[in-house]
């Protein structure tokens, strides 16, 4: 494929068919030395500010080739130079894309590592919170069991005190019954002893009367 001044060679580097460029090419085609008049007649600073680096390099290449005595068509030279620029552009663009992609990968890895670190810290925080809740639950359960044991102990002490009271009352009643029984037995023995100690006195008159009968 051969580029012409009427059609652009590449999308990235279209031929800028302005008056200045056309004037330069027309003068260069007639006589390469005539191109220097553009630098002398015009402002050199304006030339460098109004033209892209690609165009300036192309102009310089054309002048160098013409001064070296190489007879070549302007369109072919421009096409080759544009291909060279396109290749350089692609290389630089690929390098830039690689650097950008590498930075994206690095940033993605950094973000992923930060996210994993945050996730791990959050998981540890939840575990610590669960442990604290479990400890609090254990303390609550222990307090409940302790209160339950204390209530059973208090109730048991009350039952024991009630049984002791009833035992003392039963003992007192048994002692009363035993004392009454002992008193009754002693009294009965005393009465029997008195009855045995009494003497029987017979009346003589009664005896005589008994004999008569």
Swiss-Prot record:
One GO term (biological process): symbiont-mediated activation of host autophagy
Record keywords: Activation of host autophagy by virus, Enterotoxin, Glycoprotein, Host endoplasmic reticulum, Host membrane, Host-virus interaction, Ion channel, Ion transport, Membrane, Secreted, Signal-anchor, Toxin, Transmembrane, Transmembrane helix, Transport, Viral ion channel, Virulence
GO molecular function: channel activity; toxin activity
PTM description: The N-glycosyl content is primarily Man(9)GlcNAc, with a small amount of Man(8)GlcNAc.
Ranges that cross the membrane: 52-74
Subcellular location: Host rough endoplasmic reticulum membrane; Host membrane, Host caveola; Secreted
InterPro entries named in the record: Rotavirus_NSP4 (IPR002107)
Cytoplasmic compartment segments: 75-213
Residues of this chain annotated as glycosylated in UniProt: 50
GO CC terms of this entry: extracellular region; host caveola; host cell rough endoplasmic reticulum membrane; membrane
Subunit composition and interactions: Homotetramer. Interacts with the immature particle in the viroplasm. Interacts with host CAV1, early and late in infection. Interacts with host integrin ITGA1/ITGB1 heterodimer. Interacts with host integrin ITGA2/ITGB1 heterodimer. Interaction with microtubules blocks trafficking to the Golgi apparatus.
Role: Plays an essential role in the virus replication cycle by acting as a viroporin. Creates a pore in the host endoplasmic reticulum and as a consequence releases Ca(2+) in the cytoplasm of infected cell. In turn, high levels of cytoplasmic calcium trigger membrane trafficking and transport of viral ER-associated proteins to viroplasms, sites of viral genome replication and immature particle assembly. The secreted form acts as an enterotoxin that causes phospholipase C-dependent elevation of the intracellular calcium concentration in host intestinal mucosa cells. Increased concentration of intracellular calcium disrupts the cytoskeleton and the tight junctions, raising the paracellular permeability. Potentiates chloride ion secretion through a calcium ion-dependent signaling pathway, inducing age-dependent diarrhea.
Protein's UniProt name: Non-structural glycoprotein 4
């Amino acid at each position: 494929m051969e580029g012409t001044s009427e059609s652009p060679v590449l999308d990235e580097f279209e031929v800028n068919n302005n008056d200045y460029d056309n004037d330069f090419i027309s003068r260069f085609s007639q006589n390469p030395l005539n191109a220097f008049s553009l630098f002398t007649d015009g402002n050199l600073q304006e030339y460098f500010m109004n033209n892209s680096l690609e165009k300036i390099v192309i102009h310089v290449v054309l002048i160098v080739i013409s001064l070296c005595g190489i007879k070549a068509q302007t369109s072919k030279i421009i096409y080759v130079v544009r291909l060279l620029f396109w290749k350089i552009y692609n290389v630089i663009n690929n390098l830039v894309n690689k650097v950008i992609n590498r930075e994206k990968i690095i940033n993605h890895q950094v973000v992923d590592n930060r996210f994993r670190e945050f996730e791990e810290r959050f998981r540890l925080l939840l575990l610590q919170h669960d442990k604290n809740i479990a400890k609090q639950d254990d303390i609550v359960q222990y307090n409940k069991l302790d209160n339950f044991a204390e209530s059973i102990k208090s109730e048991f002490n009350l039952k024991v005190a009630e049984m002791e009271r009833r035992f003392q009352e039963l003992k007192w009643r048994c002692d009363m019954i035993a004392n009454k029984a002992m008193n009754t037995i002693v009294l009965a023995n005393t009465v029997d002893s008195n009855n045995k100690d009494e003497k029987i006195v017979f009346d003589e008159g009664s005896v005589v009367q008994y004999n008569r009968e």
